[in-house]
Amino acid sequence: VPQSKAAASHPIGLWGAVAIGVGGMVGGGIFAVLGLSVQITKGAAPLAFLLAGLVALLTARSYSLLSKSFPSRGGTVTFINRAFGPGLFSGGINVLLWLSYIVMLALYCQAFGGYAASFLPQDSRSLGRHVFLTAAIVLITGLNVAGASTVARAERVVVAIKLAILVLFVAVGMAGVSAARLAPAQWSSPVSVIAGGMIIFLAYEGFELIANAAEDVTDPGRTLTRAYYISVLFVIVLYVLVAVVSVGSLPVASLVQARDYALAEAARPALGAAGFTMIGIAAMLSTASAINATLYGSARMTYTIAKSRELPAQLERPIWNRPLEGLLITAGSTIALANVLDLNSISTMGSAGFLIVFATVNAAEARTARQRGSAPWVSVLAAAACAGALAALVAKSTVGAVTVLVAMVALSFGIEATFRRVSGTPARA
């Protein structure tokens, strides 16, 4: 086949796939969870981001192998169904994935509200945060309902802008870093550092979006593997450097006090008030674009899960040629979560949800490894790493956060079991 024809039928090259992965990860996560990470790990925040990144890197290998074996726009949903069959277990995990995306949306909304409210007088910030976060999800849902194609086209531009600002933040801020603030004497306990890394694990969620584009990638055998590794490694380095500059530039107490807008506060020493404003605006732009991308993707996910007969058929019924019922349910749930739960509970739920899903994907790779001739023990190790990370996260979480997490997992399987009972779909299809 001539190269031009191949390129026409498979329009995404290596750097396009890398852009999908990096754009998915560097959404609003780093802006949302930096302050929380510093609060838990203190001077060890860079190490916490590194540990979370290594767990993501192990899982990226499984995604790479599964994407080549089962290229599909269904991505994670398809991998789990192909490995374990479309039964109650697969359905419950896939519903958990959808709920985890709703939690991610709530996190992005809280981050948007926090950074937007940072420009208000101190006594107006609490109410302002709720107003801004609610307005963000309502307006962006409206854009998706209207099918604003310009929003989709703007995504790449927004990704480029926020990456440029983060790189500028690192480049300018590195000169003012105090090594003493990063010394082991300033770290939390080892268990707290591990738990702190896992509570911000959801900042690495996003690389799996490459799987949804696998059908459109040129030379998938080579491109997918390289795209997964390049995107995750790049983001690990970026996050660690951002954490180094943040913790090395300001006392931990200052970052914790400004937890809702920590990255903007960390820009003050090197860039002054202009830096605070620049990072604040970049955070709002980034989290708004992340809300849009995640809202669109999660609505598509409900459509895919419904097509797999794991959610009601109404969710695969398009309205105006788009799966809007899933979109509206997702948006309504996000508004409720973002306004009711605190950042700690939301981060715990989101990170734990994705750790459970990623452990299952690693197990899916191990279960189907013989089909590819790959070494299953690596994926078993990756699944164990996810499980261990989950255990560390739960061990250091508050009772309230763990209760909400257990409720989310129970709700996932409860929704799936109820649907199967009502629809007459067997528990093991």
What is each residue range found by the language model?
Residues G353, A366-A429:
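A generic transmembrane alpha-helix motif of multi-pass inner-membrane proteins
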Residues L127-G176, W187-P190, Y228-Y229, S351-T360, ...:
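Membrane-interface loop-to-helix entry segments
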Residues V1-G35, Q39-T41, L57, R61, ...:
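Membrane-interface "cap" regions at the ends of multi-pass membrane proteins
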Residues Q39, A48, L57-I137, T141-V145, ...:
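Hydrophobic transmembrane alpha-helices that form the core helical bundles
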Residues T78-P86, S118-Q122, Y229-N292, E310-L343:
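TM-loop-TM module centered on a large, flexible mid-protein loop between adjacent transmembrane helices
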Residues I40-G43, P71-G74, R82-F89, E215-T223, ...:
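Juxtamembrane helix-boundary/capping and inter-helix hinge elements in multi-pass membrane proteins
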Residues P2-S9, P46, L50, D123-T134, ...:
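Helix-loop-helix junctions that connect adjacent transmembrane segments
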Residues I30-L34, C109-F112, L143-S149, A274-G275, ...:
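Transmembrane helix-loop junctions in multi-pass membrane proteins
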